[in-house]
């Protein structure tokens, strides 16, 4: 008999959502509000993990209704982390137990920072200390092309990509983004409400660009500037693309 079924261990790209509300009706409204701040379709169909450390007195029925809340937002809840449930309860709910890993403070130069993104961290403003100055920022340098389907997030600092960011790829940074190549995918700078952040690329062909949650869909809104582009956010929340 031929062996046509092979099990392999592989890290999948999962997004983490910190759940701090037990009332699912309130949670539904909160999720609606947060998704409205993200570019249209940014999380549609995304696999999600619920972080449940802050929630207590919940049971299997609550878990099943939680899955429904995600489904109504076109999100797929596949697992939970930091939760009180046993393996039998998770099996009946159709969820997996996802080990909780503390975010790493730094990565070796050239490595990708993370493959999972916290929804709250990504689209909600953060504490004021982030804006205290660039001296405390770290820089994540990626020395290769970013392929379609990849997502790279520079947590707590700037992102430099030495290569092309292909269509379908997403790059995110708490600070600035520099692409020393062609930017074809989606770029989100200053995602913790840093309005002073900027995006620079040698060639602009992006799908979406965003600074501090303000974004432009460049597939729908044509622009003429193509080379050596610096993108900044104006005080009236419009974007300025300047050739250097």
From Swiss-Prot:
GO terms for biological process: cell morphogenesis; division septum assembly; regulation of cell division; regulation of cell septum assembly. InterPro entries: CAP/MinC_C, MinC, MinC_C_sf, MinC_N, Septum_form_inhib_MinC_C. The keyword Cell division applies. Keywords: Cell cycle, Cell division, Septation. It comes from the Bacteria. Pfam families: MinC_C (PF03775), MinC_N (PF05209). Transmembrane segments: none annotated. Belongs to the MinC family. Interacts with MinD and FtsZ. Cell division inhibitor that blocks the formation of polar Z ring septums. Rapidly oscillates between the poles of the cell to destabilize FtsZ filaments that have formed before they mature into polar Z rings. Prevents FtsZ polymerization. This is Probable septum site-determining protein MinC. It comes from Dichelobacter nodosus (strain VCS1703A). The gene is minC.
């Amino acid at each position: 008999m031929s062996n046509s079924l092979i099990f392999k261990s592989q890290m999948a790209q999962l997004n983490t959502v910190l759940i701090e509300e037990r009332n699912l009706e309130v949670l539904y409204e909160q999720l609606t509000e947060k998704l409205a701040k993200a570019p249209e379709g940014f999380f549609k169909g995304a696999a999600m993990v619920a972080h449940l450390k802050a929630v207590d007195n919940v049971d299997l029925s609550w878990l099943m209704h939680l899955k429904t809340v995600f489904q109504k937002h076109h999100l797929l809840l596949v697992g939970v982390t930091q939760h009180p449930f046993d393996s039998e309860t998770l099996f009946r709910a159709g969820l997996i137990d996802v080990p909780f890993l503390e975010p790493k403070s730094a990565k070796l130069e050239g490595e990708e920072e993370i493959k999972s993104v916290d929804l709250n961290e990504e689209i909600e403003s953060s504490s004021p200390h982030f804006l205290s100055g660039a001296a405390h920022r770290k820089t994540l340098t990626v020395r290769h092309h970013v392929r379609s389907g990849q997502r790279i997030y520079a947590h707590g600092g700037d992102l430099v990509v030495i290569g092309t960011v292909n269509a379908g790829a997403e790059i995110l940074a708490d600070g600035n983004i520099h692409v020393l190549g062609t930017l074809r995918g989606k770029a989100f700078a200053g995602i913790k409400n840093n309005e002073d952040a900027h995006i620079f690329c040698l060639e602009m062909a992006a799908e979406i660009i965003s600074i501090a949650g303000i974004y432009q869909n460049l597939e729908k809104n044509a622009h003429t500037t193509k080379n050596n582009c610096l993108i900044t956010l104006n005080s009236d929340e419009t974007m300025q693309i300047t050739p250097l």
